[in-house]
Regions:
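Active-site neighborhoods and metal-handling regions in enzymes and metal-associated proteins
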Residues: 1-376
Length: 376
């Protein structure tokens, strides 16, 4: 019946002076409950955690799946449907009536996520407007997301499996690609390959950016055809076991130009310097600045233009981030990307991205694909 994440949740709630927690972010709900294969993007689910009970409020479409997933857990499923705010207000009144709590304002603190929509917050206010017992709403800052930043072994195993698919897809796509293909043709083959290899879905919409398009870090694949001398940036990932992978490789069509080789070497050096230095206690800001320093030393100061990396998990972008703004020390169990890049508008772009986990004495890289410049 144990749920270690639920126990951690309650410990953190107590430490922050929060009695109940109203959780609507679907990735947070998935993480807290540890239910697999149940939740989708529908806004049909609420996890409501109190000091002694934990509920999932959903509707009839998810009743059977939630019932199966909750067996041998402490979660109570209520698939009655309806508005989450009204349901919580009713439960709240029943709890405090049974406990003999004196009627009044702010009888306890109810944590709400900083990502909750204003519309739903107004619904909560209305639901409690005439109630005999009213909570004090306590807005939190990444309350569950910060807990999600430290991964357990089951999560790490899922991400290693997702990355194995991604590595295999890269091995295939470099054999498939040829001069004259469009970016969209390469993208379709890449994504179909990940699915054929066992991906449950894509971690995100894949990037295939050739030639000058590669200078836009989030370029959208189009009808541009691969040309001799092009650098081609490919950023892609699979989803397996409910978790994401993320990698980027930049390859060259035909013989690489001297500039392409110079850029690639600088980006590779930055990537490998950071991966060698990551360990507990070092900050995301320090890792970002290290990459910037390596690029600057190679003549590409100010040519990255984005943060060095981000957390990965249920979502493709999680905490912690490797950015100049993050002075929080890294912890064992943090999973992050390392993705330095150089972008020269009108010419080329290059990015090299791995991801892995912070360990007791360093950084375990999940990505196994080569760091050598691959020639198509």
């Amino acid at each position: 019946m144990a749920n270690s994440r639920l126990e951690r949740m309650r410990e953190n709630m107590s430490a922050c002076g929060i009695d109940d927690f109203y959780c609507r972010d679907i990735s947070n709900v998935q993480w807290i409950t540890e239910f697999e294969g149940v939740f989708d993007d529908e806004p049909a689910h609420l996890a409501f955690v109190t000091p002694k009970k934990a509920f999932v409020h959903t509707d009839s479409r998810y009743a059977d799946a939630c019932d199966r997933a909750s067996r041998h857990t402490l979660w109570i499923i209520d698939a009655c449907g309806g508005a989450h705010a009204a349901w919580v207000a009713k439960k709240f009144a029943a709890f405090h009536a049974a406990a003999g709590t004196p009627e009044g304002e702010s009888v306890c603190a109810m944590g709400i996520e900083d990502s909750i929509e204003l519309r739903e917050f107004r619904e909560l206010e209305r639901a409690f407007s005439e109630a005999k017992w009213k909570p004090r709403f306590a807005e939190t800052d990444g309350f569950v997301k910060k807990m999600r930043a430290v991964k357990d072994e089951r999560e790490l195993s899922a991400m290693r499996a997702a990355q194995a698919i991604t590595d295999a897809a890269f091995e295939h796509i470099v054999e498939f690609m040829s001069e004259g293909m469009t970016e969209l043709e390469v993208k379709r083959e890449l994504e179909e390959t990940m699915r054929r290899l066992g991906a449950e879905g894509l971690a995100f919409d894949s990037i295939v950016a050739s030639g000058p398009n590669g200078a836009a870090p989030h370029s959208i694949a189009g009808e541009r055809r691969l040309q001799a001398g092009d650098m081609v940036v490919m950023d892609f990932g699979a989803r397996k076991g409910g978790y994401c992978s993320d990698m980027t490789r930049t390859v060259c069509v035909g013989e690489a130009t001297p500039l392409a080789r110079e850029v690639f070497a600088a980006v590779r050096e930055a990537n490998e310097a950071v991966e060698a230095m990551i360990r507990p206690g070092r900050t995301g800001a320090a890792m970002h600045h290290l990459a910037e320093d390596v690029l600057a030393h190679n003549g590409f100061a100010g040519k990255m233009g984005h943060g060095l990396g981000h957390g990965v998990g249920i979502d493709i972008h999680e905490l912690p981030v490797l950015s100049p703004r993050n002075e929080t020390p890294l912890e064992v169990g943090n999973v992050v990307t390392v993705e330095p890049g150089v972008y020269l508008p009108g010419e080329i772009g290059c990015r090299l991205e791995d991801f892995g986990v912070v360990t007791e004495d360093g950084f375990e890289v999940f990505t196994k694909s080569t760091h050598e410049l691959v020639i198509i």
